[in-house]
């Protein structure tokens, strides 16, 4: 039985209205440049305008050249900026010459800038003109518009990670708190986007568990969610409509996933280490991510309300391990995987969920001791 109440807080949070104000007041602009507009001075700044590159912006510039990333990294670490600038300028000039020789139209490069706290211009990304810009302020405003006026005023942003380019956070509002089996949860939405092409734009239902401050992103194939790449033409009216549908159904979807998640307590499993290692291999996790998952599961088993190995404990171990990551994007990746492990379908019932875990258990039993 899920009961609703409105007095649970999950860690640090801030009003949604504050975040909207911050995003709307940022100084950012875009330019369409040719190859000649990318020439560098000896400090690896843009000659035209004097902008400094962010690390990811400089990486996108270097991708236009044939220089191996290891070479670029070595020159940067050894403080060979003038030489590096010379190499890049020569490569860019070569590209411009090749276009002229082939009678191709001049390359149009979508160049993104923002100011830092001191007012200095930063070049943060370079794209082809196929890039579809939907920035964080636009996306968050669409989410806010999908709420009622009172929900918007009282909505709170949790676990915000924002560096001016990538934004990841969870959003809850009145009516999002849940009490299930004596444990406190919250349901809401997870928001993710990048203004420099490093992350998909996503708005998805989300579940948070108070006792361990873990999060889980609902990722069923049959559920409502927004997930788009910043490529081609994006119809902003259609995007806003899709977000309204997702936000409108988010609590119902999260409630359903919460029931499925808790049903996993009844799916008793034998060898948790083998199962976690098998799932790590299935989903191409790194060795370190799998080790953190094993540690997170051990911590989960020590909780007074858990104790036994089950589908619930294994999934919760994964969401616990996600909190160890220093990168919000990795945390989101692992929380999304946890959501997929809860159930592959929005309307899946207990027998289907148990059958899938039995298949995983069977595959895990065949792992060789060398792999373990």
Predicted regions: what is each one?
Residues 131-372:
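Intrinsic disorder/low-complexity polar-acidic segments
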């Amino acid at each position: 039985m899920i009961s609703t109440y409105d007095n649970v807080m999950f860690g640090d949070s801030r009003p949604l209205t504050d975040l909207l104000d911050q995003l709307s007041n940022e100084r950012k602009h875009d330019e369409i440049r040719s190859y000649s507009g990318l020439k560098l001075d000896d400090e690896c700044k843009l000659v035209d305008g004097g902008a400094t590159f962010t690390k990811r912006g400089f990486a996108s510039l270097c991708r236009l050249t044939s220089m191996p990333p290891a070479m670029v990294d070595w020159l940067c670490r050894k403080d060979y900026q003038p030489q590096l600038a010379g190499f890049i300028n020569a490569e860019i000039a070569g590209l411009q010459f090749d276009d002229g020789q082939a009678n191709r139209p001049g390359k149009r490069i979508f160049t993104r800038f923002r100011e830092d706290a001191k007012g200095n211009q930063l070049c943060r990304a370079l794209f082809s003109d196929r890039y579809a810009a939907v920035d964080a302020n636009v996306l968050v405003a669409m989410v806010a518009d999908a709420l009622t006026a009172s929900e918007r005023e009282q909505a709170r942003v949790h676990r915000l990670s924002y560096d001016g380019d990538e934004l990841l956070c969870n959003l809850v509002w009145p009516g999002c708190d849940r009490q299930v089996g004596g444990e406190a949860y919250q349901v809401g939405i997870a928001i993710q986007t990048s203004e420099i092409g490093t992350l998909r734009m996503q708005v998805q239902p989300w579940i948070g568990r108070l006792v361990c401050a873990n999060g889980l992103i609902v990722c069923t194939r049959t559920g409502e969610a927004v997930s788009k790449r910043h490529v081609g033409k994006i119809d902003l009216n259609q995007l806003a409509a899709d977000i309204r549908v997702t936000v409108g159904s988010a609590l119902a979807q999260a409630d359903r996933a919460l029931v499925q998640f808790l049903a996993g307590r009844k799916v008793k499993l034998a060898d948790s280490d083998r199962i976690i290692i098998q799932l790590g291999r299935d989903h191409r996790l790194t060795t370190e991510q799998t080790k953190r998952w094993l540690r997170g599961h051990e911590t989960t088993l020590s909780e007074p309300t858990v104790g036994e190995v089950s589908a619930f404990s294994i999934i919760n171990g994964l969401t616990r391990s996600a909190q160890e990551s220093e990168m919000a994007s990795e945390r989101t990746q692992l929380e999304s995987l946890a959501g997929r492990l809860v159930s592959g379908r929005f309307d899946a019932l207990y027998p289907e969920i148990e059958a899938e875990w039995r298949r995983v258990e069977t595959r895990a039993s065949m792992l060789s001791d060398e792999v373990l």
